[in-house]
């Protein structure tokens, strides 16, 4: 399951992300954070952490460096 989710994120990074404006307020980017979280915590907890990160990545957030 981990590899499947990571593959989906990499497909997003390769095909969808280049068509969108750069808007991530954090480093690493939200998609890179998601991959790192899934690798570190597994599919369930890593995905939940990634979703929480994506919800925090908005115009009202200061952003900054945030590693999983």
Swiss-Prot record:
- What are the annotated GO cellular component locations? plasma membrane
Give the keywords, sorted: Cell inner membrane, Cell membrane, Membrane
Spell out the SMART domains in the cross-references.
Haemolytic (SM01234)
Q: Which organism is it from?
A: Persephonella marina (strain DSM 14350 / EX-H1)
* Pfam families (alphabetical): YidD
Under InterPro entries, the record lists: Membr_insert_effic_factor_YidD
Entry similarity comment: Belongs to the UPF0161 family.
Q: Where in the cell is it found?
A: Cell inner membrane
Q: How does it sit in the membrane?
A: Peripheral membrane protein
Protein name from the UniProt record: Putative membrane protein insertion efficiency factor
State the protein's purpose. Answer: Could be involved in insertion of integral membrane proteins into the membrane.
């Amino acid at each position: 399951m981990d590899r499947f989710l990571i593959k989906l994120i990499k497909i997003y990074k390769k095909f969808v992300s280049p068509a969108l404006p750069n808007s991530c307020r954090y480093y690493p980017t939200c998609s890179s954070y998601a991959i790192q979280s899934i690798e570190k915590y597994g599919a369930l907890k890593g995905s939940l952490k990634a979703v929480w990160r994506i919800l925090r990545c908005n115009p009202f957030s200061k952003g900054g460096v945030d590693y999983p």
